Curated annotation (Swiss-Prot):
Name of a matching Pfam family: Ribosomal_L11_N
UniProt PTM comment: One or more lysine residues are methylated.
InterPro entries: Ribosomal_uL11 (IPR000911), Ribosomal_uL11_bac-typ (IPR006519), Ribosomal_uL11_C (IPR020783), Ribosomal_uL11_C_sf (IPR036769), Ribosomal_uL11_N (IPR020784), Ribosomal_uL11_N_sf (IPR036796)
Protein name as catalogued: Large ribosomal subunit protein uL11
GO cellular component, one term: cytosolic large ribosomal subunit
Gene: rplK
Biological process annotations from GO: translation
Length: 141
């Protein structure tokens, strides 16, 4: 028989830098999960992706064991990394902060494909382009 699920926790953590400090400790502590075991496992799995924010979905079972699924980094984080900016524009419709090429968009879209509900890479590119525009990043043709 399958283990009974008692909780689902969604967090966005810096790759390789999970520690028992907030937000990880309190979120896992209230479900009775071994915080250090999670941090160690998460940091091992994300060590290669240093510098990125990684969304993680943690499933907690009745016997206080857990499993987790790593998602792809948010499109906004990948766009900021691709164009080399610290943050998006405060007023994206007026102030443009950077330009992104179609090749960069395609690269990000292909990386995000497993987490997007897009049927094709072109549809995924349009989603990523929309995120870029909402950050004040101009998409070059």
């Amino acid at each position: 028989m399958a283990k009974k699920v008692t909780g689902m926790i969604k967090l966005q953590l810096a790759a390789g830098k999970a520690s028992p400090a907030p937000p990880v400790g309190p979120a896992l502590g209230q479900h009775g999960v071994n915080i250090m075991a999670f941090c160690k496992e998460f940091n091992e799995k994300t060590a290669k992706q240093a510098g990125l924010i990684i969304p993680v979905v943690i499933t907690v079972y009745q016997d206080r064991s857990f499993s987790f699924i790593l998602k792809t980094p948010p499109a906004a984080v990948l766009i900021k990394k691709a164009v080399g900016i610290e943050s998006g524009s405060g007023v994206p419709n007026k102030t443009k902060v950077a330009k992104i090429t179609k090749e960069q968009l395609k690269e990000i879209a292909e990386m995000k494909m497993p987490d997007l509900n897009a049927g094709s890479v072109e549809a995924a590119m349009r989603m990523v382009a929309g995120t870029a525009r909402s950050m004040g990043v101009t998409v070059e043709e």
